[in-house]
């Protein structure tokens, strides 16, 4: 219950703009760009440099895939719903700097396949 209250109580994620994400990628800043869609969606096209971790596996696999809880993470999905859930989950697991880009539909650049 404490995790649930903590996660949703302080759980409003800060939304990253397209320009902010583009600048971070261009400067090659040290952060994780986390795609929380399905493997099939990821294969159809993803933002370059993204790491795939489906949102329904975040709780089970975050520790092994994202060992540094201080490293900034920017999360995205298709529309923004799953990324918001994943951001709250990651914060509840102790990740300190989690931001939400929302949906890949906001991305105006090229996609990798």
Explain the meaning of each model-derived region.
Residues 1-24, 31, 39-72, 78-113:
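Rhodanese-like catalytic fold shared by cysteine-dependent sulfurtransferases
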